[in-house]
From Swiss-Prot:
PSII is composed of 1 copy each of membrane proteins PsbA, PsbB, PsbC, PsbD, PsbE, PsbF, PsbH, PsbI, PsbJ, PsbK, PsbL, PsbM, PsbT, PsbX, PsbY, PsbZ, Psb30/Ycf12, at least 3 peripheral proteins of the oxygen-evolving complex and a large number of cofactors. It forms dimeric complexes. Its main location: plastid. The gene is psbH. One of the components of the core complex of photosystem II (PSII), required for its stability and/or assembly. PSII is a light-driven water:plastoquinone oxidoreductase that uses light energy to abstract electrons from H(2)O, generating O(2) and a proton gradient subsequently used for ATP formation. It consists of a core antenna complex that captures photons, and an electron transfer chain that converts photonic excitation into a charge separation. GO terms for biological process: photosynthesis; protein stabilization. It holds the Pfam family PsbH. NCBIfam families: PRK02624.1. It is found in: Plastid, Chloroplast thylakoid membrane. It is a single-pass membrane protein. GO terms for cellular component: chloroplast thylakoid membrane; photosystem II. This is Photosystem II reaction center protein H. InterPro entries: PSII_PsbH, PSII_PsbH_sf. The modification Phosphothreonine is found at residues 3, 5. It comes from Glycine max (Soybean). It comes from the Eukaryota.
Length: 73
């Protein structure tokens, strides 16, 4: 047959590199969640400001806001 069996002792594990060793501490907090609300209120404020920004852009695009000194054709 054309199948080949590989023994467990012939396979090598993951290779260790300098970059991997430097980045490992960054991944050590994976899956952990800080208790409480954290930065949720800050994100809510950012989303509200972004929504206001988008509505202003939309009103300017629809020419529903008249800007002094700027002619909209």
């Amino acid at each position: 047959m054309a199948t080949q069996t590989v023994e467990d002792n012939s396979r090598s594990g993951p290779r260790r590199t300098v970059v991997g060793d430097l980045l490992k501490p960054l991944n050590s907090e994976y899956g952990k969640v800080a208790p409480g609300w954290g930065t949720t209120p800050l994100m809510g404020v950012a989303m509200a400001l972004f929504a206001i920004f988008l509505s202003i852009i939309l009103e300017i695009y629809n020419s529903s806001i008249l800007l002094d000194g700027i002619s909209m054709n």
